[in-house]
């Protein structure tokens, strides 16, 4: 249970009609990441996304993420751990009811802060097909492949692998 205070700042900008920019920052005390049992340290997350509608059918976007945390190491000293990522995506409306999207992400967890295995870089590719059945309902099928430089993904048999493939069926109701 974390009862510490967190500061959150955010801004959404729409400087021209087809461009949307969102920036957010969070900072506050969080429990130290595993495998340590150290006390809480200050975690700071900065995220920026931008999307641009090229026309009614095509949109592109990008995202940048940077997260750091100070981990107490004793005697009042701290060690800073971090991870960061960058992503790009695009979507295309094939018809008024069918949309496709592709997302590519690179993620660097060099300190093992997020996934627990230091020195690991990740690449993820997601392809999404969507059927817009109504203004309030969307059906999706999504295929995602994750690839790491180290074996960090647990397989069905318990062994670790450098890659992971997932498929999802989704129904989204908008209200």
Question: Where in this protein do the model-derived segments appear?
Answer:
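Outer-membrane beta-barrel pore domains
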Residues: 13-15, 19-175
């Amino acid at each position: 249970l974390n009862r510490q205070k967190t500061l959150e700042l955010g801004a959404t900008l729409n400087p021209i009609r087809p461009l949307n920019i969102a920036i957010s920052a969070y900072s506050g005390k969080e429990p130290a990441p595993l495998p340590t049992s150290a006390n809480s340290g200050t975690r700071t997350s900065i995220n920026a996304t931008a999307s641009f509608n090229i026309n009614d059918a095509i949109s592109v976007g990008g995202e940048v993420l940077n997260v750091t945390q100070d981990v107490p190491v004793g005697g009042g000293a701290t060690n800073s751990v971090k991870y960061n990522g960058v992503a790009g995506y695009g979507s295309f409306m094939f018809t008024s009811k069918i949309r496709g999207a592709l997302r590519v992400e690179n993620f660097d967890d060099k300190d093992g802060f997020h996934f627990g295995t230091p020195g690991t870089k990740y690449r993820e590719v997601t392809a999404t097909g969507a059927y817009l059945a109504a203004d309030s309902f969307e059906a999706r099928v999504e295929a995602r492949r994750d690839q790491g430089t180290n074996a960090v993904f647990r397989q069905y048999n318990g062994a670790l692998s450098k890659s992971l493939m997932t498929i999802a069926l989704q129904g989204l109701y908008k209200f």
